[in-house]
Structure formats: C-alpha cells, structure tokens
Amino acid sequence: MIKNIVLSSGVMRGYSYVGVLKSLTKNNLLNDYENILGCSIGSIFSLLFVLKYTAEELEAIIPKIDTNIFRDIDYTKIIEFPSTYGLCDINKIIKVVDILIKAKTKNKDITFKELYDMTDKNLIIVSTCLNKWKSV
C-alpha cells in the first residue's frame, strides 16, 4: 500500500507522470494512497490523479494542449519576478486547468474540501513564498 505520492516540479518531468499513472494503475496501487503532494507541474498532475484522469485520457489530452504555455517564459520579468510570482503567464495555465477540473467535477471553482469529500484523497500543493523565501 502506498500512503503518499509526491510529484515534483519540472515541465519535462510532467510527461513522465503519465507513465507513473500507468504503473500505479497496472499494479492496483492508485486507489490505496491517502495523500498526494505536488509542486509546480507536479501540482497539476497531482490534481489530475485526484480527479481520476486515466493515463489513456491524458495521452489523448496532452497533445491537444499548447505546452508552450509552460515554457513561454518572459525573461524581461526576471527583475519583477517577486511581484509577478513567476516567469510564465499563469492565466494561460489557469484556463487549461479550469477546463480539466470542470470536465471531471462540473465545477471549475471546486474547493480542496469539496474535492476531498468527492475523492477521499488529500491534495497538497506546495509552493514558495517569494517574499519570505519559505514553503507555503
């Protein structure tokens, strides 16, 4: 039994999480976990795991997503990084995530509590406060 799953950051690593999902499913381990923790792209895939997206669904969806939204870095924002909270346009990412959430829950604004009540899985998202340089 797996109690915790941790998915880390790195856009290219995100593609490998489809393989992780396949392996967990094949070995009947996906229903047993209690907590899933993600950071950056890992947080998006953690959400998709909790929403019960299958590897086959993700293999069909991912090629349709303009993955440049995860690599579309405006390097002129480096100086503004602490106030803009990132180098990518978060609004483009939010649009994609909203569609994926709504497809499974019918509610793009679902709360963590509602998601837990629906799935019995704890979704934990980790990020760093750039002003205080600590995890939040």
Predicted regions and their residues:
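A generic local structural motif
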Residues: 23-25, 109-112, 124
